[in-house]
Amino acid sequence: MHDIKQPQGIIYIIRKEECNMKKGMTILYKVHNNLYVNLTNRCPCACTFCLRQNMDTVTHDDQTLWLEHEPTVEEVKAEFAKIDLSEYEEVVFCGYGEPTERLDALLEIAKFVKENYQKPIRINTNGLANLIWKKDVTPELKGLVDTISISLNTPNADRYHELVRSKFGDQSFDAMLS
């Protein structure tokens, strides 16, 4: 296991290639009554509590959530075609990476789901999309995403920085709150 160090305020994030986790192509997976969409392994954070640091999977059927490659929009649509969405309450963008890292794909898939399945859509996020894209992305989500769940994790910036270890450093906490 690699240690994460912070010399001179620089954050080093463990890369998937440095870990010994198995990879697969679990694009869609079920949690309770919801269908989850796993779009990427990329994340601007290295949270000390994140399951992906130590586990291949969080699903009951033991399928890995580490992706061999980022699925294309067409691959995701093909996965949707294989299942009956009537048994799910909502579609949730959440996997082993930050879903807004692939904002264009997320938006295209959300539009596809809205047009074809009329299911509520939620994004589970670290809340740093505006830093990732260097712009306010919230207008792009309007009409496509019904709920955004932001992982707050701590009540203050110092503790947040200590636990979340965002590559954006000190600006992350305030950006996540805005």
Label the model's feature ranges:
Residues 3-4:
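Short hydrophobic alpha-helical segments enriched in small aliphatic residues
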Residues 9-20:
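Short, Lys/Arg-enriched N-terminal segments with co-localized hydrophobic residues
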Residues 54-60, 87-91, 156-159:
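Short, basic/glycine-rich phosphate-binding loops at helix/coil junctions
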Residues 68-75, 171-175:
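Soluble or luminal CAZymes and related metallo-dependent hydrolases
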Residues 73-94:
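Short Fe-S-cluster ligation motifs
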Residues 81, 96-178:
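Conserved AdoMet/S-adenosylmethionine-binding subsite of the radical SAM
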